[in-house]
Regions:
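Terminal low-complexity "docking" segments
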Residues: 1-241
């Protein structure tokens, strides 16, 4: 695996064009507190909350943000030095910030193959980078506003596609092969999605176990073939009988 790239090295390898801007997408849920770091060192126009104007506008503790970063900003030094891998990422786009914001807002929730909506942690590089890598150029159909990414020191380029109109969340459907790939690469992604589904759709099962026991049981469940919501519900119900 190539050595991690710093933001300055990445920008030197991929110089920005005159019509491009450098964006940061970050999540408040990270213990690294990237928003606080921005407030300390950036001192420029504040990033915008992605979920503003949605039913989740008050979820400040887990709010994702998007902002424009100047190439010489001290915030990029913070990015280079942080050890966190879930804080967010950098990307280059020729789109205005409002367009970028609306496309990210459209990914607030996505559909799993069984038509169940779940939140997408698009700001979390540990989840989003494997998705982009597996989708390849197809990632542009999910998020067409970005051409180049730097996520946890890894550079990724996506072939551009025509900029589609923004759509209200949820609209994007997670392909079955991608879900299987994520389960192989990082079972925790699948575990988190299943736990979220239980919390939203089957609170009776979600609250029937302590959090640690439920995590263990779901982690055990995902080892088997034929993973699905109905199968998980049957498995947990059998554990209670």
């Amino acid at each position: 695996m190539a050595s991690p790239l710093s933001p300055s090295a990445w920008l030197a390898e991929n110089p920005m064009q005159s019509d491009e801007q450098l964006y940061v997408v970050m999540g408040s849920a990270s213990e690294a507190k990237p928003f606080a770091a921005w407030q300390t060192v950036a001192g420029a126009k504040p990033p915008q909350p992605v979920w503003a104007g949605t039913p989740y506008a008050g979820w400040n503790e887990v709010m994702p943000y998007v902002g424009v970063v100047e190439p010489g900003s001290a915030f990029l030094d913070w990015v280079a030095n942080t050890r966190a891998v879930d804080w967010g990422w950098l990307a280059v786009s020729s789109c205005p910030q409002e367009v970028v914001l609306n496309h990210l807002k459209g990914l607030t929730q996505v559909y799993l193959p069984e038509d169940q909506p779940v939140f997408l942690r698009f700001w979390d590089g540990t989840q989003f980078l494997p998705m982009l890598q597996h989708l390849g150029d197809g990632a542009a159909r999910m998020l067409p506003v970005f051409q180049r990414y730097l996520i946890n020191g890894q550079s990724l380029a996506v072939s551009p596609c025509p900029l589609a109109a923004t759509k209200p969340s949820p609209w994007w459907r997670v392909p079955v092969p991608l879900l299987a790939h994520l389960a192989q690469q990082s079972p925790q992604v699948l575990i988190d999605n299943l736990l979220q589904w239980l919390q939203e759709q089957r609170p009776d099962l979600y609250t029937a176990f302590s959090p640690a026991i439920l995590q263990y049981k779901v982690a055990y469940f995902v080892r088997r073939p034929g993973i699905g919501h109905a199968e998980l519900a049957d498995y947990l119900a059998a554990q209670l009988s």
